[in-house]
Regions:
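Short Gly/Thr/Asp-enriched flexible loops that form oxyanion-binding sites at enzyme active sites
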Residues: 86-96
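Short, well-structured alpha-helical segments in soluble
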Residues: 60-73, 90-92
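Short, acidic/small-residue loops that bind anionic groups at enzyme active sites
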Residues: 94-117, 121-132
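Periplasmic-binding protein-like
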Residues: 73-81, 102-103
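Conserved small/polar residues in nucleotide/adenosyl-binding loops
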Residues: 136-143
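Glycine- and acidic-residue-enriched helix-capping/strand-helix junction motifs
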Residues: 16-32, 120-126
Length: 147
C-alpha cells in the first residue's frame, strides 16, 4: 500500500502597512487564531501552516513561488484581513501553479455597532480587500489559462 505524503496547506494573509505596526500585530494574531481553529476542527485532510502577513508585491511573489517549489505544500489559503492592494498580488498569482482557496470572510462574527470606530474599520476591511483580490485571482487564472 502506498503511503500518502504529509502535505500542508499554507495560510497567507494579505494586508498593508498603511495602518501601522499595531494593526499588523492584530492581523497576525487574527491569522494565528484562524489557523489554530482550522487545525483543531479536524475537517481538513492536512495541517494548515501560518505564513507571515503579506504586505508587498515582492513578498507575495516570493511566497507563491516558494509554495510552487515546496513538495509538501498542497496549496495556499489566502485571506485579506485589511485592505490589501490587489495590484500587489498580480505577479505572484500569475506565477502560482497549485490549488488556491480564497477565504472570503471577516474575522469578527459580530460587528460592534455600539462601539465601532475608525480603528476597528481600518483593521477589518476584509470585504473590500477580498473583492479586489478575488477579481485579481480571476484575472490571473484567465491569463494562466490562456498561456
Amino acid at each position: 500500500m502506498k503511503a500518502s505524503k504529509n502535505y500542508k496547506f499554507w495560510f497567507a494573509t494579505g494586508s498593508q502597512d498603511l495602518y501601522g505596526d499595531e494593526c499588523l500585530r492584530k492581523v497576525a494574531e487574527h491569522s494565528r487564531i484562524i489557523v489554530e481553529e482550522l487545525n483543531k476542527s479536524g475537517v481538513l485532510p492536512y495541517e494548515v501552516v501560518l505564513k507571515p502577513t503579506l504586505i508587498t508585491n515582492e513578498v507575495i511573489r516570493r511566497t507563491f513561488n516558494e509554495a510552487n517549489e515546496d513538495e509538501e505544500c498542497a496549496g495556499v489559503i489566502t485571506w485579506m484581513h485589511t485592505f490589501s492592494p490587489a495590484k500587489s498580488w498580480i505577479l505572484g498569482l500569475q506565477e502560482y501553479r497549485k490549488p488556491l482557496l480564497h477565504l472570503h470572510t471577516q474575522f469578527n462574527q459580530e460587528i460592534p455597532y455600539d462601539t465601532i470606530d475608525m480603528d476597528f474599520m481600518n483593521e477589518n476591511q476584509s470585504a473590500h480587500g477580498d473583492r479586489a483580490v478575488s477579481y485579481t485571482h480571476l484575472r490571473a487564472h484567465e491569463t494562466a489559462a490562456n498561456l
